[in-house]
Amino acid sequence: MPTFASGAPGRCTRRADLRVALGIREWNVFGDSYGTNLAMTLMREHPQGIRSVTLDSVEPPEVVTAGSFAPNAREDFDRLFRACTAQPQCWPRRPGIEQTFTQLVRRLEAHPVATQVVPLTGGSPVKVVLDGGRLVNWFIGEAFNTAAFRNVPAMIAELANGDPRPIATEVASRVVSSGIGILGYGLASGVGCAEWVPYERGSVVSIGRRAFPAYPVSVFRPALHVTYLPQGWTVWKVPKAPAEQRAATPSTIPTLLLAGSFDGITPTSWARTAKRTLPNSTLAEFAGIGHFVTLASPCAQQVFASFLATPSTPNTACVLAVRPPRFAPAPPARG
């Protein structure tokens, strides 16, 4: 495990050495998701030669743990439910979307539903078993596909009407087309087991229960996103990251923070946490955008380009015009 043995500090040292070796006097640093964690470590330990830093979907090293993803999901769910409620065509049925989703989680956790679907990428039909935990994970995973948000309420309504196929098709498609592979899962587990699990602030199950008190406890054992990591740590056997690796990043380097309001992985609250110690930073929050903001938002791309041109005064005017998507109408209740 040589990659994990050096941890984030070692990886950042190699990047700093690369800048010098290439003869680059100054460079602009970009990080997204876990890459923002590395970028902040680079700012803290090797600030020389950094002209600007862009942090997209911000993960502050001082707050992230496996248990933190339940409250993050709660923040995302609440915002999407509110956005849906604000659009009459989104959910013209009773009970409301949040209550309906909670009922579905409880029902499916007690009585999972199996169905055969063809993944969106084609191929042979695959069997998908949809339980409460998998339903929650489906919702969290929508953060990676901003274009799909407009259909989320309608898909929940179809499930409530007894048709699991729309959601099951997305679940199957993620599995067959993720492209992560064994190495990707190994890298992710190495990070989580070295940098997050040893610094948990309590049981991930207890944290999940506080975030979603109406969900069955079995949803958090170990279904919810990365709550399996504490169990995996016992067999993965990577060394614990040093405490200083999880320090906040005080820096005066011009920094752009980009956050999506529908990001249940790295929520906007995390971007605000990072901003507290970055006095020369600009925070842009994008309504209705999920994870990887610059990939999903033309406005974010404009802000990013403006920031690279003038890091001290980026033009963020377009952010005010960004709105949540117009949701597809939910089908009426059957029966």
Residue ranges and their predicted role:
Residues 11-26:
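Conserved acidic catalytic loop of the alpha/beta-hydrolase fold
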Residues 13, 31-43:
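Glycine-rich nucleophile elbow surrounding the catalytic serine of serine-hydrolase chemistry
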Residues 29-31, 56, 258:
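Short beta-strand immediately N-terminal to the catalytic nucleophile in serine-hydrolase-like folds
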Residues 41-104, 138-141, 154-179:
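A catalytic-pocket lid/entrance helix-loop region that shapes and gates access to the active site
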Residues 100-253, 296-297, 313, 324-333:
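Alpha/beta-hydrolase fold active-site neighborhood
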Residues 148, 264-270:
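Conserved alpha/beta-hydrolase "acid-adjacent" motif
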Residues 254-262:
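Conserved strand-to-loop "acid loop" that flanks and positions the catalytic carboxylate
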Residues 287-335:
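Catalytic active-site module of serine/aspartate enzymes centered on a nucleophile-bearing elbow/loop
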